[in-house]
């Protein structure tokens, strides 16, 4: 079946006169990519031409060609077959004409069929950080009979934190690229966009609290444009409901007798919110949903959390009773406002850690309290278990006691930009899940990363698992990933590099948010050099002791990439992968050198200390140089993009978020310090390195005087001025324009790794 020959068209894409927007979008996407592959301009038409191959896109209800094929028993396609968002790619002969059918049980399925043809048959590689388009002036298809149906009916991607950690300065093209990628990865639920900002003002005006708000702008905001585009792509968007916090003082003057709770998040300033047992709380939710539905419609999914990550300071003697008040009041309000409402409570609120009076976050839950809370919700619900791959709350709550739920992979927290994640472990965990009878009510897979555009190898795996985990094996995934990303020949050559990574940083001893094995320069150095959860300290020590074995494997991975000069010259994604792997190789060596310096200090070995200290500072310089050569890893570039949000304050605001998470100068909380740590050239050069250098100088002075102890107060006095100075100083532009591949070759040629 010929689609193109020598760069000229031999086919036409046929849609019905009543084709939906999404079906026409599928046709437009297909003709765009076929042109990129072959150079041919393939027309999209409602009237099949007399000659050439026909590509029929849609369903029987919208495309007469497909209806004829079904009526004459050439094809089976309906809402129930393949079913869900399933699709088929089928070559048939209809009335003597060669016809390729791309159809779905839903409109989304039809779009997935078009992308599957491109990716699975024609060799296009779709990735978050780029695409690989093969060159084929002649496109000849074999006989095709492909049918796919998702295992999980719902597939969500997105987390509210990524708006802060990744998307704060995105423009329309950035957002469109992100949601097009989600469509290619068959996502059908996304995290809410920021479109409800004017609703509270309108409600409080109706309640007589505030004057009438100004009319909304005539032009839609960026998030409103993205919202509309996302809906066109067939993705559902939940509505985030207010908790009754952030009310103006005028509200409390108008309703002086309303019940409130005094809350606190981390160590920041306490705030008030409506008590869920107060009648105004239910009224607020009903009115909010009414306004939201009038403006945006509804997908009937509602996110509502009580005190997620916050503590109740005043207003409730029994926290569990307030939680139950919240469950009951929210249920009643949603049933009144939207009879088809589905509540999606998040397990993130269910902190099942051992109770700790010093916990700066919410009061902890027991599994019995979780059950009582879920049972108090009196409308349909689906628990979003946001951290299934590590926290395993679904196991501790006996699969949420029979309630519908979704398996969520969080993986990358705000600091999740380094290479990490247990690839084989995730595959095995999901396979155990789908073979467990108790998990029968899990029909949702969530990918809940806080930061995107890092660890693509891990998140592409999540996308495959979310569609259908049954055929996914590590070997099959690795081969597919490399072939699509680099091409068949180069991909096969690079598989050994990724095996090195999966045996190390993407293996069972990879770091997590609990067992932190991040680059040690990201934190204030001390004499412990352990930054994970205290209960995991012994395991962290054991893992650090085995970390030297990672270094030669990472070096080998770098060398394998360097053995592909033609690919590195033509494939930007391969260059980016080389930068990331080389960066990790440097980070691992730094962490080991810092541990050696600390050990030498404690052992009063001045010579060994100086040797390790020199390695630490040299590696940070090498890291800075490499990062500066890759534009997305430059701090000055990030600051420049943030100017549209912060104007002349962009440098301070951007740096402040990396130190304290928040933008505001007066909002500092010790548990949040360095949470948004990452590798940007200016962060390493002007924040992390000065802090490491000060640490080494302090230990050097102590060593000279025979001391082996440093108090927390001494460290704080040392680091606070560095942090404050970094935030206050204008962003510095480091040298740019170097070839990252040449830098990595130079670093490899410099000699063996210093890990002893």
Where are these regions (language model features)?
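Contiguous, structured surface segment used for ligand recognition
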Residues: 1-150
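Ordered core of a single globular domain
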Residues: 571-624, 692, 696-725
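Catalytic-core regions of glycoside hydrolase
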Residues: 42-43, 51, 131-139, 161-162, ...
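N-terminal small/glycine-rich loop or linker at the start of catalytic domains
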Residues: 144-166, 263-270
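Extended, compositionally biased alpha-helical segments that mediate assembly or anchoring
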Residues: 684-756
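Solvent-exposed, acidic/flexible segments
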Residues: 19-27, 107, 168-175, 216-223, ...
């Amino acid at each position: 079946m010929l689609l193109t020959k020598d760069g000229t068209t031999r086919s036409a894409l046929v849609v019905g006169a009543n084709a939906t927007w999404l079906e026409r979008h599928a046709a437009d996407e297909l003709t765009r990519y076929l042109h990129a592959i072959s150079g041919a301009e393939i027309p999209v038409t409602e009237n099949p031409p007399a000659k050439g191959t026909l590509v029929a896109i849609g369903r029987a209800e919208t495309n007469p060609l497909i209806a004829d094929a079904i009526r004459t028993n050439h094809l089976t396609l309906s809402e129930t077959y393949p079913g869900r968002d399933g699709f088929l790619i089928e070559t048939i002969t209809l009335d003597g004409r060669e016809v390729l059918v791309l159809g779905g049980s839903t409109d989304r399925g039809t779009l997935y069929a078009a992308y599957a043809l491109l990716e699975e048959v024609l060799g296009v590689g779709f990735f978050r950080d780029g695409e690989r388009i093969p060159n084929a002036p002649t496109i000849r298809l074999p006989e095709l009979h492909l049918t796919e149906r998702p295992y999980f009916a719902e597939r969500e991607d997105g987390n509210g934190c990524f708006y802060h950690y990744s998307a704060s300065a995105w423009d329309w093209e950035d957002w469109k690229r992100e949601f097009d990628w989600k469509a290619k990865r068959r996502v059908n639920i996304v995290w809410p966009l920021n479109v409800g900002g004017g609703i509270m003002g309108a409600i409080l005006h109706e309640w007589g609290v505030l004057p009438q708000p100004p009319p909304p702008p005539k032009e839609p905001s960026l998030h409103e444009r993205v919202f509309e585009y996302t809906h066109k792509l067939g993705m559902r968007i939940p509505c985030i409901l207010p908790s009754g916090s952030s009310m103006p003082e005028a509200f409390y003057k108008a309703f002086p007798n309303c019940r409130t709770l005094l809350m606190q998040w981390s160590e920041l300033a306490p705030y008030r919110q409506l008590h869920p047992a107060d009648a105004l709380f239910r009224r607020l939710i009903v009115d909010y949903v009414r306004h939201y539905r009038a403006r945006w419609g509804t997908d009937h999914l509602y996110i509502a959390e009580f005190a997620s990550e916050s503590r109740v300071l005043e207003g409730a003697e029994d926290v569990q009773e307030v939680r139950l008040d919240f469950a009951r009041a929210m249920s009643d309000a949603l049933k009144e406002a939207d009879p088809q409402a589905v509540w999606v409570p998040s397990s993130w609120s269910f902190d099942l850690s051992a109770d700790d009076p010093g916990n700066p976050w919410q009061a902890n839950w027991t599994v019995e309290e979780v059950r009582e809370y879920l049972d108090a919700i009196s409308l349909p619900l689906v628990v979003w278990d946001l951290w299934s791959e590590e926290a395993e709350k679904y196991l501790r709550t006996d699969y949420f006691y029979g309630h519908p739920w979704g398996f969520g992979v969080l993986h990358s927290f705000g600091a999740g930009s380094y290479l990490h994640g247990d690839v084989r472990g995730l595959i095995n965990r999901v396979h155990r899940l789908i073979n467990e009878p108790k998990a029968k009510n899990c029909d949702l897979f969530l990918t809940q990363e806080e930061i995107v555009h890092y660890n693509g190898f891990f998140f592409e795996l999540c996308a495959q698992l979310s569609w259908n985990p049954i055929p996914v094996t590590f070997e099959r995934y690795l081969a597919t990933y490399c072939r699509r990303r680099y091409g068949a020949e180069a991909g096969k050559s690079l598989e050994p590099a990724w095996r090195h990574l999966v045996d190390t940083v993407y293996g069972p001893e990879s770091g997590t948010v609990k067992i932190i094995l991040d680059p040690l320069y990201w934190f204030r150095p001390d004499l412990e050099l352990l930054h994970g959860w205290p209960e995991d300290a012994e395991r962290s020590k054991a893992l650090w002791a085995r970390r030297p074995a990672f270094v030669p494997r990472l070096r080998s991975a770098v060398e394998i990439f360097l053995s592909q000069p033609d690919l590195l010259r033509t494939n930007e994604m391969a260059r980016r992968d080389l930068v990331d792997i080389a960066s990790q190789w440097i980070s691992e060596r730094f962490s080991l050198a810092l541990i050696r310096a600390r050990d030498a200090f404690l052992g009063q070995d001045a010579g060994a200390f100086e040797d390790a200290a020199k390695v630490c500072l040299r590696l940070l310089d090498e890291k800075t140089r490499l990062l500066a050569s890759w534009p997305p890893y430059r701090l000055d570039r990030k600051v420049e993009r943030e100017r549209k949000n912060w104007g002349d304050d962009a440098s301070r605001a951007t740096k402040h978020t990396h130190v304290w998470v928040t933008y505001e100068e007066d909002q500092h909380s010790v548990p949040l310090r360095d949470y948004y740590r990452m590798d940007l050239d200016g962060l390493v050069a002007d924040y992390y390195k000065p802090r490491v250098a000060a640490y080494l100088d302090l230990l050097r002075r102590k060593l000279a005087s025979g001391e082996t102890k440093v108090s927390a107060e001494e460290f704080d006095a040392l680091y606070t001025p560095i942090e404050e100075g970094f935030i206050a100083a204008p962003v510095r532009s480091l040298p740019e324009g170097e070839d990252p591949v040449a830098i990595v070759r130079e670093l490899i040629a410099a000699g063996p790794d210093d890990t002893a």
